[in-house]
């Protein structure tokens, strides 16, 4: 397997994050750098701690530990259709993630 965002052990990855209950840093969804807990069950992004809910969510696969909002978090897809459940969603790519996002879309 190619060394990419799916290679476990990376401390940081560029991921797709969609707030199913509202906005995320002024957009419905964002693509940006995240870090993980040592157990890989918590994703950290923009000061938020998103805990994996393992199929117990209604619309998402992670929940914000502080606000209770549900999130859909996934890897970057080459075709760009990262939105969960085929929804029309506006996505903003963080400035510091643009180069890596383009590389991932080409390699995927």
Each model region followed by its residue ranges:
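Mixed-charge, low-complexity intrinsically disordered regions
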Residues: 1-33, 40-42, 46-108
């Amino acid at each position: 397997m190619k060394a990419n965002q799916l290679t476990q052990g990376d401390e940081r990855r560029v991921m797709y994050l969609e707030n199913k209950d509202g906005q995320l840093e002024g957009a419905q969804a964002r693509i940006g750098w995240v870090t993980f807990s040592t157990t890989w069950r918590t994703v950290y992004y923009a000061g938020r701690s998103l805990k994996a809910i393992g199929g117990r969510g209604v619309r998402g696969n992670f929940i914000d530990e502080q606000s209770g909002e549900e999130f859909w978090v996934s890897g970057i897809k080459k075709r760009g259709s990262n939105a969960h459940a085929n929804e029309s969603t506006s996505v903003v790519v963080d400035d510091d993630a643009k180069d890596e996002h383009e590389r991932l879309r080409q390699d995927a």
